[in-house]
């Protein structure tokens, strides 16, 4: 299991909270993080929305199972265009984050949470994009 935190830093950004930034250049396709997870069976997934942990769960597989990522990965914010993708590593029980593009030092790491803008605003407090 690899932890590549020397490439990253966490900063507090007004209006967003904690955010993960590249501390140095990260090449497209590079493994950025491989964080351990806590598995949450699908049968318990309805309860996560009723706790503060609910904002930090990720889809683990196609069977509606979830996981809590233990590391910087849980602090990566929603944003478009996203610059990292997620891969569930079932063998090592880790969530892996890969660079979708070259990421410059100082850029925030972002991925698409996959929710509609109403849910992003209501649940996560992310403002809806401006309508032209």
Regions found by a protein language model. Give the residues of each.
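Conserved catalytic SET/PR domain of SAM-dependent protein methyltransferases, capturing the structural core
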Residues: 1-132
